[in-house]
C-alpha cells in the first residue's frame, strides 16, 4: 500500500518495550501542543552514556537521561500509548526519535536497531531509511543543540535538584538562546 510502513500494522511493541529519550525540543513540542507541564510526561532513568546520543543531565547530583514517562501499572508502556494498532496518543507531536525509529543515529550512519528490535515485521534498511533521512538530519541537529544546552546547564554551579526545575531551566535556556541568536 502506498504510504504504508512497517509501523502501519504494528500493535506498539516499541511503545511497550523502550524508554523514549527526549530532547528539549521534543519536550517543548509536546508541552505546547498538549497543554501539559513537562513533569506530567517526563521522568528520568540512570544515564545511558555511550548508548545514547543525547547527553545525560545532572539532576540531584546524578547523571540521568530524561525520557517519556512510562505507565505505572506494571505494563511499562509509554504514557502516551493508547493500545492497539497505531496506538500513539500524540502521533502528530511524538518525539523525533519515535519518528525515525527503528533507525538511530550513530557515528557513520543510521543503522536499523536490529539487536533488540521488537518489530513484528521486517524493514528494508535502504528503502525505509530514504524516507527518514530529513527527519534523521533534523534529529541530529536537535540533539546537537540540546546537548550544548545541557552541557552548559550541567556545568553551572547551581545544579537542578529535581526534574521539574531542571526542565524549567532547560526550556528557559532554549528560549533565551532563540531570542538572542534566532536559531532553531
What are these regions (language model features)?
Residues 1-184:
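Short loop/turn segments that flank or connect secondary-structure elements
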